[in-house]
């Protein structure tokens, strides 16, 4: 086991604080509409330019092990806030730095760190209640667009697109962000349920120009095993032919005699039919087939349930208004499933997503939820250069998460004002002893730091701006750093999601309190490397 280096008390806290400051100073320059960019060197390719706090935080690794521990703790704050709310990482970093700075001074002055922590926790609880009381629900698409615009650093086109996407696919819908090939940023919406499997054979195509198969008002057979023999299918095919409606077969695979006969019938015009493979693999495939069955009002034909293909009736088939089948995708539009069944299935998937510990599983469950709930929107981000596209994509991701958070828990005035106003609520908060009072005071000061930082990034004096904002009793009154004016921020469209502000404060206070109560730090001693040996001597007349 390698030897360890141990630091105690003030020495440990000082080193840790240096690490916190290095990381926070690099991140906080990005805060607000006039925040600056940070350029990050890459081991290959062009450097990356970003204004996204968490992207900057993730790149910072310090040589001194003790400083690095402080920096990594703040990085953890940014990551956690990003995971929970998707935005607010820079605000969380600024708050952490402010709380740790003041807290370290208080501990150095001999105050009890545990009482400081209790005071901090008390104050945070009061502020969160104040944020909840003052947040208001989003009522129209223009407010949704404003949240997106603020989070995308004032780019209104991004805000408008996100608002439009959410209108089309609903708040539960999946909105993915991709890099576009051209200069334009565009929105593409796929309504209905889409899965990534296309036709089994190109002979099923009905529209040769577009290379797609279109089925109007089809029956849908959902079968979890392979279809190789035609015999079990015959009774069902006869019923479908008599009904005069098309048939879509979704099965693990369709091959051999079954496929050949279906293709021949399709070409002769006797039967409008198409077959696609079932989406997903293993247990996920079963779950997705069940989703399709619920969406279309059908039944999964499975031997587990004791249903044999020979006995299937038309009542056990699903139906939909329209099905589009491309080479690699199938879209089911307006399935005929009962809305109550679909809602029930959505609740079940939502519960699974909350319980799972795997990010991958959660992402897949959310995709399934979106497909059931209404559709998928894709925002393709364009730009003149690759670096610009990546930078804009970061901002679109932030804006998307912020908008979702705003729909969830409502909005508060932006520009750091909601936290600054909440600091006034701490003036007469009760405490058990003097040290707790100092903890409350630490939070009271820290709550003004985001407002001050936004003002300083815009070239103003942070203390003066904070003073003017708090002198005015109107809750929504604040400083618009973009124009340099004081105004009603909510009516000017400068708003933050309450969830983002709440999460930033909770995560910052949690980690900062841990840093303040640290008394010892342990790190591995760097190994002393032996000096390299001298090169061998030359041989005789060999000149180099």
Swiss-Prot record:
Keyword field contains Cell inner membrane: no
GO molecular function, one term: isomerase activity
GO biological process, one term: protein refolding
Main location: cytoplasm
Any single GO CC term annotated in Swiss-Prot or TrEMBL for this entry: cytoplasm
Signal peptide, first to last residue: none
InterPro entries to which the protein is assigned, alphabetical: Chaperonin_Cpn60_CS, Cpn60/GroEL, Cpn60/GroEL/TCP-1, GroEL-like_apical_dom_sf, GROEL-like_equatorial_sf, TCP-1-like_intermed_sf
Major enzyme class: isomerase
Gene3D superfamilies: GroEL (3.50.7.10), GroEL-like equatorial domain (1.10.560.10), TCP-1-like chaperonin intermediate domain (3.30.260.10)
EC number, as in UniProt: 5.6.1.7
Quaternary structure (record): Forms a cylinder of 14 subunits composed of two heptameric rings stacked back-to-back. Interacts with the co-chaperonin GroES.
Name of the protein this chain belongs to: Chaperonin GroEL
Species in which this protein is naturally found: Granulibacter bethesdensis (strain ATCC BAA-1260 / CGDNIH1)
Gene that encodes it: groEL
């Amino acid at each position: 086991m390698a030897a360890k280096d141990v630091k105690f008390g003030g020495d440990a806290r000082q080193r840790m604080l240096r690490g916190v400051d290095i990381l926070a100073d690099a991140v906080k320059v990005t805060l607000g509409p006039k925040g600056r960019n940070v350029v990050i060197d890459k081991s290959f390719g062009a450097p990356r330019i970003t204004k996204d706090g968490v992207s900057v935080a993730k790149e910072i690794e310090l040589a001194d092990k003790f400083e690095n521990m402080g920096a990594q703790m703040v990085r953890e704050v940014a990551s956690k806030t990003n995971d929970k709310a998707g935005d607010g990482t820079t605000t969380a970093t600024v708050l952490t730095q402010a709380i740790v700075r003041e807290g370290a001074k208080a501990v150095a002055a001999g105050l009890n760190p545990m009482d400081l922590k209790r005071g901090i926790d008390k104050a945070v609880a009061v502020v969160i209640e104040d944020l909840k009381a003052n947040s208001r629900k989003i009522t129209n698409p223009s407010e949704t667009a404003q949240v997106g615009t603020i989070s995308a650093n004032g780019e209104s086109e991004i805000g408008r697109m996100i608002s439009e996407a959410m209108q089309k696919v609903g708040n539960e819908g999946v909105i993915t962000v991709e890099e576009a090939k051209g200069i334009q940023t565009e929105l593409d919406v796929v309504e209905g349920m889409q899965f990534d499997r296309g036709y089994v054979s190109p002979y099923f195509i009905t529209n040769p120009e577009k290379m797609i198969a279109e089925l109007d008002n089809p029956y849908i057979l959902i079968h979890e095993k392979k279809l190789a023999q035609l015999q079990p299918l015959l009774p069902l095919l006869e019923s479908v032919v008599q009904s005069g409606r098309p048939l879509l077969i979704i099965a693990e695979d369709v091959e051999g005699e079954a496929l050949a006969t279906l293709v021949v019938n399709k070409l002769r015009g006797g039967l409008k039919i198409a077959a696609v493979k079932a989406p997903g693999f293993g247990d996920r495939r079963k779950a997705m087939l069940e989703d399709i069955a619920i969406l279309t009002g059908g039944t999964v034909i499975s031997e587990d349930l004791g249903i044999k293909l020979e006995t299937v009736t038309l009542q056990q088939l699903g139906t939909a208004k329209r099905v589009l089948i491309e080479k690699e995708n199938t879209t089911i539009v307006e399935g005929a499933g009962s809305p109550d069944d679909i809602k029930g299935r959505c609740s079940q998937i939502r519960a699974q997503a909350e319980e799972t510990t795997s990010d991958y599983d959660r992402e897949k469950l959310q995709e399934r939820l979106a497909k059931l709930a209404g559709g998928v929107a894709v925002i393709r981000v364009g730009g003149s250069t690759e670096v610009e596209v990546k930078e804009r994509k970061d901002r679109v991701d932030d804006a998307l998460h912020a908008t979702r958070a705003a729909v969830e828990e409502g909005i508060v005035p932006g520009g750091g004002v909601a936290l600054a106003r909440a600091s006034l609520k701490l003036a007469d908060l009760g405490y058990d002893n003097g040290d707790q009072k100092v903890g409350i005071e630490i939070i009271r000061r820290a709550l003004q730091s985001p407002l001050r930082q936004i003002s300083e990034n815009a070239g103003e004096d942070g203390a003066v701006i904070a003073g003017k904002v708090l002198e005015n009793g109107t809750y929504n009154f604040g400083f618009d750093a973009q124009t340099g004016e004081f105004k009603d921020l909510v009516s000017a469209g400068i708003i933050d999601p309450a969830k983002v502000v709440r999460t930033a404060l909770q995560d910052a206070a949690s980690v900062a309190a841990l840093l303040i109560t640290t008394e010892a730090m342990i790190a591995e001693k760097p190994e002393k490397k032996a000096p390299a040996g001298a090169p061998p001597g030359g041989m005789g007349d060999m000149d180099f």
